[in-house]
Amino acid sequence: MAHGEPYYSSKPDKDFNFGSTMARRQMTPTMVAKLPNFVRNSPQAYDWIVRGLIFPTTGKTYFQRVVVITGGLEDGTYGSFVFDGREWVEIYPIEHLNLMSSLKLIHKANALQERLRLSQEEKATLALDVQFLQHENVRLKELIPKPEPRKIQMKWIIVGAVLTFLSLIPGGYAQSQINNTIFTDMIAACKYSTETLTENLDLRIKLALANITISDKLDAVRQILNFAFVPRAHWLRTVFYYIHYYEMWNIFMFVLAIGTVMRSARPGTDLITLATSHLSGFRMAVLPTIPFHTTMTLWVMNTLMVCYYFDNLLAITLAILAPILGIIFLCFMEDSNYVSQIRGLIATAVLIAGGHACLTLTGTTTSLFVVILTCRFIRMATVFIGTRFEIRDANGKVVATVPTRIKNVAFDFFQKLKQSGVRVGVNEFVVIKPGALCVIDTPEGKGTGFFSGNDIVTAAHAVGNNTFVNVCYEGLMYEAKVRYMPEKDIAFITCPGDLHPTARLKLSKNPDYSCVTVMAYVNEDLVVSTAAAMVHGNTLSYAVRTQDGMSGAPVCDKYGRVLAVHQTNTGYTGGAVIIDPTDFHPVKAPSRVELLKEEIERLKAQLNSAAENPATAVTQQPVVTLEQKSVSDSDVVDLVRTAMEREMKVLRDEINGILAPFLQKKKGKTKHGRGRVRRNLRKGVKLLTEEEYRELLEKGLDRETFLDLIDRIIGERSGYPDYDDEDYYDEDDDGWGVVGDDVEFDYTEVINFDQAKPTPAPRTVKPKTCPEPEAETQPLDLSQKKEKQLEHEQQVVKSTKPQKNEPQPYSQTYGKAPIWESYDFDWDEDDAKFILPAPHRLTKADEIVLGSKIVKLRTIIETAIKTQNYSALPEAVFELDKAAYEAGLEGFLQRVKSKNKAPKNYKGPQKTKGPKTITH
């Protein structure tokens, strides 16, 4: 194959074609057969290198070329091999960047294909398991016996009918049947009239004697309500007419018997209890005691009530002896059953004895019924918190629990109705992200972690002292490095580069700890629990049943944002440590340079204090212990204000002392010196030294404020170059120069605190024949301003040559005030378009001071261009320039004139002999 077709090991190798084609042509069958184990379907780079560069060679063989192949091996390494005539020998790897990038992509693709294959196999296995489970589910459903419709036995229907018949008997008093005749009707009418007259007479006597009782008042109110709210012909009167023959117990037992037959799980026991309570006469007093009974004590109560029907004294004796006998003969039971049985026997004794007393004294058991209800209510109010009694042994282990919630042995269908009742509340949804969870596996055990940002967050005790941990995510295992562990029980693990979670959790910006959600992996199953939490400093506590492996789980709010990291495991309660954004990064310790700077500042402060109080500094002795003094906030504020006032005063004095040479009077606005080059402009001169500049910055003056102050000073003391033209002078055009006349400003001046002072180029000054002495600078008296102006005008008229004016004080305005005559002309579309510059060409001062007026003028300009009516434009521009003049800014009409028209007597740029600038 020498000098034949190029050799390619695979299609990707041919597509990439890395290296030398000549080297590929040198491949022989022997070389191909002995090739190293490169990655299948991967490219290689072929090089044809001089032999002497690889092997120690002398003579003519030095310049012979050999084939070198570089590629990725199956063991994951990268290497280069050269053929020495017999076999391939590994040499130092040659770096081919494109080849290395391609191998990385191929390796990643192979890894993804392997994951896909494993996932597909797992999916097929799970699908098969699901099918098996579905078949098993169907088979088990067929084995479950179908519930048959409930059938009520005929004997219970007969017993219920008998009880219903007994309850419908009005009473035990028989009434004789009387034949109604005209005489009997007259007797009944007379009897009714006599009773009514008697009631009226009694009422009048009571009113006369003022002997009205509370019962009389209640009867009167009842009659008023009866006649006021119930009409004379109403169905309620008919119902009450028939009901008043029956007692309340009869009606209640009728309803209870029907409910027992229809809904009770044990109708026989319930109906027998109703029958015995009716026969014994205890009636309503029996019902409140039923929750205290067990099955055995319930039958004891029924037996004693039947015995009471025949012999009340025997029943009372047995009822009193029942608790004593139960304590003795039931001691073989376990504690929980023993307590329940004794409690039922005591309730039976109270019922029999108290019921007999009430029947003997009052003839009814209503008072006993009220007493038992009151006791139950008090007991219920005192045990609202606890839900069970725990019985413990000597070691403190709970061996049994007795629920405080009373369960009925009889008539339990009410509780079933309550359980199947209508819900009264709606629970809120919570957001969970299972894709953000992973399992942290260490030699000590397993824990839960979650992805947040570029880290995996878990509990520090789940990581232990390990530097590297295994992260299990979606069935795959990754090795990750522990990045940082703060003082809290939290660990931050760097997320591996090839691990890409489907979801990440974010920290809560506004934490709400009222309701928290804990989600974790336990035995490869996702568990989620929601509970109310309490904050204890930097920790949370909540009632959640926790298990091993939940350490490091996220504790989130209802929106799925992280609040804390789950920590403790007590079985019934959970705890977590609150996580903050500051916990993600370690607090950097100050460097040695920063510590030295702080020490220097402290020493400077001590030196300044010693300089201010030299006597104290000399006589002060070192004190071993310092007295602690309590200082209020107001004292601290006063001290800070005093210190700031002193520092600002010192700062003002220093600035005034430094800038005093530059705060000089300005020259008057004349045209006498236009042809003369101004001197002493101090171009490129440093206004302050670097030490003074830093000192001002340390005093509290920031850089931006300081630069603004320097710009203002420059604007007050410098301006455009002024030339002296002896041949030109116009008294009427005294206000010609607008830009640069009232403010002397040199745009070429450079403020530089680091560069050296440039050397100004020499200038040729036009000699003067009759120089006049300059007058000394005097402060301007505002009261004599008009007189000086008149004198100045007279001197200008008399002189044959323009003279210099006296320096004028600094003015906050720019140029001359706008005059209406300058704006009163015929405006056209071009004038309207170019009167305002583009928005990006406006200065910051224009936007701040004239922003609203500029927007208004733009609106007027747009309207004028659309309607071709420019009558309102002059007044608007005049108002804008007037506002600009008052703010110390240049008018916009003046800017247009300055831009379109060069200044008079402009002689072009000045010629200097400075260094040339070479541009590349």
From Swiss-Prot:
Catalysed reaction equations from the record: RNA(n) + a ribonucleoside 5'-triphosphate = RNA(n+1) + diphosphate
Recorded consequence of changing residue 729 to A: No effect on viral replication
Post-translational modification: Cleaved by the viral and host proteases. The protease is probably autocatalytically cleaved. Cleaved presumably by viral and host proteases.
E.C. designation(s): 3.4.21.-
GO molecular function: 5'-3' RNA polymerase activity; serine-type endopeptidase activity; serine-type exopeptidase activity
Renumbered residue ranges of the record's region Disordered: 753-813, 900-920
Organism (species): Human astrovirus-4 (HAstV-4)
Modified residues (O-(5'-phospho-RNA)-tyrosine): 693
Effect of residue 728 to A: No effect on viral replication
Compositional bias ranges of the Basic and acidic residues kind: 783-795
GO biological process: proteolysis; viral translational frameshifting
Protein name: Non-structural polyprotein 1A
Membrane-spanning segments: 239-259, 286-306, 313-333, 344-364
Family: Belongs to the astroviridae polyprotein 1A family.
